[in-house]
Regions:
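Hydrophobic alpha-helical transmembrane segments of multi-pass inner-membrane transport and secretion
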Residues: 53-88, 167, 198-224, 467-502, ...
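Nucleotide-cofactor and metal-assisted catalytic machinery
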Residues: 1-49, 131-153, 224-472
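Intracellular coupling helices
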Residues: 73-118, 178-190, 487-528
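Alpha-helical transmembrane segments of integral membrane proteins
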Residues: 45-50, 78-105, 109, 129-254
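Small-residue-rich transmembrane alpha-helices
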Residues: 76, 112-184, 225-226, 523-574
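Conserved G/P- and acidic residue-centered "switch" motifs that form tight phosphate/ATP-binding loops
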Residues: 74, 97, 110, 122, ...
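C-terminal transmembrane helical bundles of large multi-pass transporters
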Residues: 440, 444-537, 548-552
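Residue-level signature of transmembrane alpha-helical entry/exit and packing/kink sites
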Residues: 57-58, 102, 107, 149, ...
Length: 574
């Protein structure tokens, strides 16, 4: 059961969770021991709605912000270079009586026009590509289909343009309008050596954007390493050749559990009669269904029948399954037996546990024959009946691909919840049997309908889609940022060479070799690049823990990533 509530003023999610646990304990005492296996959990609605999309959205937002800052730093450096060539013009304006504010206003307005033109082009590109991007976005973001480039989006774009103009244009305009530029009237050569302060400013901007590029590339590298680890992950089942669907039926017509079980059996038998079908089973919640599922507490034999005992044990992922479900999903039996016709509503309550759960509850012991009480245990006189472990199966990724859980399976005829998802293993193309499956269901119950048809391979691909999308976006942003950094370094070196033309000529006249001159000019950009790399690596190391929750199978301080990114940028800088 799911309930939605609004927190009172001054209350926190933690306080609500504590109060909800107290209510659950009181209900347990009021109803004897029949609620022992029930658990109440509290989750912020935003976290529940965003689910797997949250890390992807955070990664994209962070990459977008970093790319904007890098672009601003690059543009500011280019404006400083451009402004250096206008020193004489600005000095003449001052000599003719122009005030500093007037010059700043003119230079800033030029930058504002450039930013607005870029903003219009960006909005136009977004408008043209918006539908294609939204339709192909694999992330399950709530209300994504209602997204549009409306007045709010245009206002946000305008604010970004104005903010960018301030960040990019204000400092260069103020810098070049200083009264000290009057000295430019005395410059007879455009190749005069630049002032040390202007050179330092340009170097700081280039080093700063290079540091931001390091952080962005580090994030992209960690995401790629995480995705690689996910691709190597053993999901615990074989998705190839498996068709999944839901069965909708009239609860008025199938108003008892016995009638519903009979319908499930008939549908599975109809599927098995198809020549292409290898195995067919059903389960309460199919693997990789996301955060939605059924959680349960557990008490094992030897522990007191109280909620305090359950709190010491892990929360389990509860499933109801038909006997052939494990064969249909190719979930391997490791020990004991699978469910069969013996496991009925009137027989001894039995369960199958995942391997990790068996090790957790009974370390270094044989779990077969052990007894527990979890959700679905029958109740006799308000006292739950022990459920006996008859089998141990391989762990399967039951909810999210990133998060392993402790799996508990009940026979579908002993479970309080009806199976919902049908899994059919086919020797050929799974979708090829859909018409025959629908015809078989219609022959059993004309009012029943087959919904949610998909292959398990598509389900697995959708589970990886958010990761794949994040990597593509962050990597694209990182590549653009790397291009910006390369342009910034090249501009710095070229401008430094232009400004030192007279010095270079003197050195050449005194016998300096070409390689000496090249080394002299290149050193200007090399030391700036090394400083930016050092700051970027240090910043990435400080911020590494902020992305830990978005990673899988890789440490936030991964040595390979922290070594490869500076090496790559060092090569680009050279």
């Amino acid at each position: 059961m799911y309930a939605i509530g609004r927190l009172a003023a001054g209350e926190t999610v933690e306080n609500a969770a504590e109060q909800l646990s107290t209510i659950a304990r009181n209900e347990e005492l009021k109803n004897g021991m029949s609620n022992t296996s029930m658990v109440a959990t509290t989750t912020p609605l935003m976290t529940h709605l965003l689910g797997a999309a949250r890390p992807a959205l955070l990664a994209i937002a962070g990459a977008s912000g970093a790319l904007l800052l890098i672009a601003c730093a690059n543009a500011a450096a280019l404006l400083l270079v451009h402004g250096a060539g206008r020193r004489r013009e600005i000095a003449v304006r001052f000599a003719l009586g122009a005030r500093r504010l007037q010059v700043v206003r003119q230079l800033f307005c030029e930058t504002m026009v450039l930013c607005l033109i870029a903003g219009v082009l960006g909005v136009g590109l977004a408008y043209v590509s918006f539908d294609a991007i939204v339709s192909r976005a694999p992330i399950a973001v709530p209300r994504l289909d209602q997204a549009a480039i409306d007045v709010r989006a245009l206002l946000f774009a305008l604010v970004v343009c104005l903010g960018t103009a301030v960040m990019v244009g204000l400092f260069p305009a103020w810098r070049h309008s200083g009264a000290a530029l009057l000295a430019g009237l005395h410059d007879r050569s455009r190749s005069a050596t630049p002032t040390s302060s202007s050179a330092r400013t340009r170097k700081l901007l280039v080093a700063g954007q290079l540091a931001a590029v390091v952080v962005l590339l580090m994030a992209a590298g960690l995401f790629i390493r995480s995705f690689t680890a996910l691709l190597r992950l053993d999901l615990g089942f074989d998705s190839r050749g498996v068709l999944t669907f839901n069965l909708g039926f009239s609860e008025d017509r199938h108003d008892t559990k016995e009638k519903q079980w009979a319908l499930v059996d008939a549908v599975l038998d109809s599927a098995r009669r198809l020549p292409e079908v290898v195995a067919a089973g059903a389960v309460y919640q199919r693997p990789l269904a996301g955060t939605i599922g059924w959680d349960t507490n557990v008490i094992i034999e030897g522990q007191p029948l109280a909620s305090e005992s359950a709190s010491r044990n892990p929360i389990l992922n509860w499933e109801a399954a038909t006997p052939d479900y494990f064969r249909a999903m190719d979930i391997r039996l490791l020990h004991g037996r699978l469910f069969d016709e013996r496991d009925t509503a009137k027989s001894l309550p039995v369960v199958i546990v995942g391997q990790s759960l068996a090790v957790r509850l009974w370390p270094r012991q044989d779990p077969l024959g052990r007894r527990m009480i979890a959700y679905g245990a029958p109740v006799a006189g308000n006292i739950p009946v022990w459920q006996t472990v008859v089998g141990v199966v391989e762990d399967a990724r039951s909810r999210e691909v990133e998060a392993p859980r402790f799996d508990l399976y009940l026979p579908y005829r002993q479970a309080p919840n009806q199976v919902q998802h049908f899994m059919v293993r086919v020797s050929g193309d799974p979708l090829a049997v859909v018409p025959a499956l629908k015809a078989g269901v219609a022959a059993i119950d004309p009012e029943a309908r087959v919904d949610g048809i998909s292959t398990m391979e598509d389900v697995v691909n959708r589970a990886f889609a958010a990761w794949r999308f994040s990597i593509i976006v962050v990597s694209a942003f990182a590549a653009i940022a790397l291009t910006f950094a390369a342009v910034g370094i090249a501009t710095l070196v070229a401008f430094a060479a232009t400004q030192r033309t007279r010095e270079i000529g003197v050195r050449a006249a005194l016998g300096a070799q070409r390689r000496d001159v090249v080394a002299l000019v290149a050193s200007e950009g090399t030391w700036t690049a090394l400083a930016g790399l050092a700051v970027g690596v240090l910043t990435a190391w400080i911020l590494r823990m902020s992305v830990e929750s978005m990673l899988f199978g890789v440490a936030p301080g991964d040595a390979l990533t922290f070594a490869a990114v500076p090496l790559l940028l060092g090569i680009v800088s050279v």
